[in-house]
Amino acid sequence: MVSVNDLKTGLTVKTSDGSIWQVIEFQHVKPGKGAAFVRTKMRNLRNGAIQETTFRGGEKIERAHIERKRMQYLYPMGDTYVFMDNESYEQLELTSAQVKSALPYLLENMEVSIADYEGEILGIELPTSVVLTIVEADPGVKGDTASNVKKNATVETGHVIQVPLFIEPGEKVTVDTRTGEFMGRYNG
């Protein structure tokens, strides 16, 4: 059990209904009148839902111990995706529902972290940025020089991102996996 006064960003907790939540934001509030409380924004690790919850100061909630395993993505197989444990070389098959949020950035041989709670796979954590190759890009409109003009570009995974006008097919770009935003050309 952990006191809500000790909550930190990234901490995982289990609520009374059995849901597993990760704290995204928290704020200790001590009003001039009345008891202190903690306002939180949390993400459900099973379905991705985000919820704002308020706890009374000093309230206790159960901490969920999430084990993170380093694994390598090998290949898709029908409706499943095959991963290999880097230490034991055991293979793990995940459904498309379990890897849905990672699919736009998932490349073969990519190292990922798989979140496991008591044998239940909760999801995949990607590196914060990935290098992807542009396979198709809308043409840039000549003379359109307004600042920060973007165009659509399709990367090798089939995902469409917004890139600056000067990016052409065949170029490698760095993409933020948390926001899906273009970070820059890859220089490597």
From Swiss-Prot:
Domain of life per record: Bacteria
Protein's UniProt keywords contain ATP-binding: no
UniProt keyword annotation of Ubl conjugation present: no
Principal location class: cytoplasm
Biological process, per Gene Ontology: peptide biosynthetic process
Gene3D superfamilies linked to this entry: 2.30.30.30, Nucleic acid-binding proteins (2.40.50.140)
A Pfam short name: EFP
InterPro entries: Elong-fact-P_C, NA-bd_OB-fold, Rib_uL2_dom2, Transl_elong_fac_P/YeiP, Transl_elong_KOW-like, Transl_elong_P/YeiP_cen, Transl_elong_P/YeiP_CS, Transl_elongation_fac_P
Gene Ontology terms: cellular component: cytoplasm
Keywords linked to the UniProt accession: Cytoplasm, Elongation factor, Protein biosynthesis
Pathway assignment: Protein biosynthesis; polypeptide chain elongation
Cell location: Cytoplasm
Family of this protein: Belongs to the elongation factor P family.
Role this protein plays: Involved in peptide bond synthesis. Stimulates efficient translation and peptide-bond synthesis on native or reconstituted 70S ribosomes in vitro. Probably functions indirectly by altering the affinity of the ribosome for aminoacyl-tRNA, thus increasing their reactivity as acceptors for peptidyl transferase.
NCBIfam families assigned: efp, PRK00529.1
Protein's UniProt name: Elongation factor P
Organism the protein comes from: Exiguobacterium sp. (strain ATCC BAA-1283 / AT1b)
